[in-house]
């Protein structure tokens, strides 16, 4: 069981981040058999300084039979910047996509909110059941959709990347992430193991996803300024997007 009573920086973060963090943890606990995932020493909770402001990074990490690693990262820079980052890394024994979402918020509001179920199979497509369910979801209008980065071909056609401009759009985003989460958790429970040959192919897909995500220069620059290049490289490669064995 998750220790939800434990103090968390999400209680001081932007309301959308706080609501989404609670939602993610509640779905994990509802559907999955969670065991703690051991992060490298000193990287579970981190404090530093960036441009005179205190930077706090708080990680929640678990694993299950279906997921080799489930990572929720919350970060807060003074009173100026709040971040949520979440990825569910599948156990390559199962034909599951990658769930991922990120939110970046400041006093001015949410500047970026992205969520996706990203393919890991050799065809670069989601399983048929995922496609059917996601295609049937109600269409929502967002006033400011954002462009994916150059390496964004790892994402699916259902990827949602926006700058929500009001509380209604924030609620629509939260609703869509919840739909992604419920579908993904339910499908993971009925997923059938792959053959050894198939496992190698899905492992390659996950490897590609992590390798492309490691190219996110914005994340690297922030971490390097606060903790140095060596630490940033270690954190990105061992915590954020560790490559599967």
Swiss-Prot record:
Report whether Protease shows up as a keyword of the record: no
Which Pfam families does the annotation name?
Fe_bilin_red
Would I find Hydrolase among this entry's keywords?
Answer: no
Catalytic activity as recorded in UniProt: (2R,3Z)-phycocyanobilin + 4 oxidized [2Fe-2S]-[ferredoxin] = biliverdin IXalpha + 4 reduced [2Fe-2S]-[ferredoxin] + 4 H(+)
The processes (GO biological process) annotated in the record are: phytochromobilin biosynthetic process
Reported EC number(s) for this entry are 1.3.7.5
The UniProt entry, under InterPro entries, shows: Ferredoxin-dep_bilin_Rdtase, Ferredoxin_bilin_OxRdtase
Single GO molecular-function term?
phycocyanobilin:ferredoxin oxidoreductase activity
Q: Where are the coiled-coil regions?
A: none
The residue ranges crossing the membrane are: none
Keywords linked to the UniProt accession: Oxidoreductase
Source taxon at top rank: Bacteria
UniProt cross-references to NCBIfam families, sorted A to Z: PRK02816.1 (NF002760)
* Role, per record: Catalyzes the four-electron reduction of biliverdin IX-alpha (2-electron reduction at both the A and D rings); the reaction proceeds via an isolatable 2-electron intermediate, 181,182-dihydrobiliverdin.
Give the family from UniProt.
Belongs to the HY2 family.
> Per its record, how is this protein called by name?
Phycocyanobilin:ferredoxin oxidoreductase
State the organism named in the record: Gloeothece citriformis (strain PCC 7424)
């Amino acid at each position: 069981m998750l220790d939800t009573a434990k103090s968390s920086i999400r209680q001081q973060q932007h309301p959308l981040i706080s609501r989404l963090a609670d939602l993610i943890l509640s779905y994990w606990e509802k559907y999955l058999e969670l065991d703690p995932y051991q992060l490298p020493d000193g990287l579970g909770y981190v404090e530093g300084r960036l441009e005179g402001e205190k930077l706090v990074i708080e990680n929640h990490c678990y694993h299950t039979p279906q997921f080799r690693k489930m990572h929720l990262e919350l970060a807060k820079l003074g009173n100026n910047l709040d971040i949520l980052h979440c990825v569910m890394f599948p156990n390559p024994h199962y034909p599951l996509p990658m769930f991922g979402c990120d939110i970046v918020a400041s006093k001015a509001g949410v500047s970026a909110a992205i969520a996706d179920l990203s393919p890991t199979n050799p065809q670069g497509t989601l399983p048929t059941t995922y496609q059917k369910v996601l295609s049937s979801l109600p269409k929502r209008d967002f006033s400011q959709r954002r462009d994916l980065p150059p390496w964004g071909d790892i994402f699916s056609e259902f990827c949602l990347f926006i700058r929500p401009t009001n509380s209604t759009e924030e609620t629509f985003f939260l609703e869509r992430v919840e739909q992604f989460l419920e579908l993904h958790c339910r499908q993971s429970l009925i997923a059938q193991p792959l053959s050894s040959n198939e496992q190698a192919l899905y492992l390659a897909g996950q490897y590609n996803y992590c390798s492309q995500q490691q190219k996110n220069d914005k994340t690297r620059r922030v971490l390097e300024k606060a903790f140095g290049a060596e630490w940033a490289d270690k954190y990105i490669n061992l915590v954020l997007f560790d490559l599967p064995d």
